Each structure stands twice: as C-alpha cells, then as structure tokens.
Amino acid sequence: MEPGLAFYQEKMDMKASKSIIQKITASNGGVFTGPGTNSYLIGTEDITLVDPGPKIDAHLSNLLKLGNNKIKRILVTHTHPDHSPGAKVLGDKLNVPLMGRLVAKDDSRQDRTFKPDQILSHGDTIKTSEYTIEVIHTPGHASNHLCYLVPEEETMLT
C-alpha cells in the first residue's frame, strides 16, 4: 500500500470507533475496484447511504441489515457500474429518494438504470439532526461525479 494510502487508512481506522460513518466493501474486487467498491452509511437514526455499489445480492442485503430500516436517502458519487446499480434496487425496496446527477448521454460506460429523484448540484446541502452533507461537483473521473463532505466527521466521500 502506498504511504499516503496507509496514513489515510490508519486515520480512518482510528476514527472508526467513534465515527457516524460506516464503510462496507462489496465483493467486486478487481483492477478498477481494488478490494471492492466502498459503500457508506452515514448516521445512526437518519441514515444516508452513499454509493450502494453493484447489484450483488449479498452486498445489498448487508446494507439493508446494517441500515436497520433507518436509511432515508441514497446518494451516488457517479454512475459507473461499480457504484450505482444497487441504488434502484434499494430505492425501490426502501421507498427512499435517489440523489445524484444525471447520466451523460454520450457515455456508454455509465449505469443507465440510475434515475435520480433529486438532482444534486454543486453547493447543495443535506442537513439532518446528526450531520451535514455538502455536495461538491468534481467532474473528471466521470462528468457527473460528486463528492460529499461531512464536516462533522472531517471526511470527504469521493
């Protein structure tokens, strides 16, 4: 592991015991995903799910179990097939809004099943009684890529 990544992981591990952000890794390890796509649950009562990942039944079931019927919204960082296909499945099952940006029409590498109920823009804010999520548009990796800053946790989900 690169020194910078090791430091980042160590910092995340130190915060994990008191953090309201829980990381869950899908079993889709590979060249582009490393050990697998990371999904995140933010909060303890009013939970936000970020990047539900691919449609892998065991992963989606695990997210539902850990979300404990408290997931109120699903956000995606971008619509590559390893990040967003689980959104529709879980959104339908939980009856919660899907949030993110539209798929670029000219990009065939995108997950076309993702249709946000709410389109997020740079500068948008999601507030709950536990935390705030600040939306940052970061095109590059994907034209519809968003990052989510959780100031209370000093954490940016990319």
Where are these regions (language model features)?
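A detector of low-complexity, intrinsically disordered, Ser/Thr/Gly/Pro/Ala-rich segments
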Residues: 9-13, 42, 123
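N-terminal amphipathic/basic-hydrophobic helices that include classical n-h-c signal peptides
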Residues: 1-11
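Active-site HxH/HxHxD metal-binding segment of metal-dependent hydrolases
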Residues: 6, 30-35, 54-134, 153-154
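Conserved beta-strand hairpin/beta-sheet module of binuclear metal-dependent hydrolase folds
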Residues: 15-66, 147-158
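Short beta-strand His + acidic residue motifs that chelate non-heme Fe in jelly-roll/DSBH
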Residues: 135, 146
